[in-house]
Design a protein with these regions (language model features):
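Residues that form generic nucleotide/phosphate-binding pockets
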Residues: 10, 24, 50, 78, ...
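Short, hydrophobic/amphipathic alpha-helical patches that form generic packing surfaces
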Residues: 42-57
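Conserved short "hinge" loops at termini or chain/domain junctions
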Residues: 1-43, 90-105
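Short loop/turn elements at secondary-structure junctions
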Residues: 16, 53-105
Length: 105
C-alpha cells in the first residue's frame, strides 16, 4: 500500500482531487508514492486532517452539472477521530463537536 492509498483510506467516504492530496503531501514533506508503514502513520494522519479541514471551509461545490455538499459536523467528527487515533489531543479538542461543560470559578 502506498502513502497515497493510506490517505485515501483516511479520507473515506470523502472523495478529493489527487492534486489536493499531492499538495498536502508536499507541504508535509512526504512522497505519496512511497510505501506506507507504521512510521508514516503520523504524517499520513496530519495530511489527511489538513485535507479534511479544507473540506470544512468548502462545505459544498458544484461543477459541470453536479454538486456535492459536506456535513460539517461529520467532517469534524472524522477529523477528531483521526486526531485521537494518532495522539493529536490539541487537534481532537479543537474539532470535537460534543458539548463541553466548563466549571466557572
Amino acid at each position: 500500500m502506498l502513502i497515497h492509498d493510506a490517505i485515501i483510506g483516511n479520507l473515506y467516504p470523502y472523495d478529493v482531487d489527487d492534486n489536493l492530496i499531492l499538495k498536502a503531501c508536499i507541504d508535509h514533506d512526504v512522497a505519496p508514492e512511497d510505501e506506507y508503514s507504521y512510521e508514516a502513520k503520523s504524517v499520513v494522519a496530519r495530511v489527511s486532517i489538513e485535507i479534511l479541514v479544507n473540506l470544512i471551509s468548502l462545505s459544498s461545490e458544484s461543477d459541470s452539472g453536479y454538486s456535492l455538499s459536506y456535513n460539517v459536523d461529520k467532517l469534524k467528527e472524522r477529523i477528531c477521530f483521526i486526531a485521537k487515533s494518532n495522539g493529536f489531543a490539541d487537534v481532537a479538542d479543537e474539532y470535537d463537536i460534543k458539548p463541553k461543560v466548563y466549571i466557572m470559578d
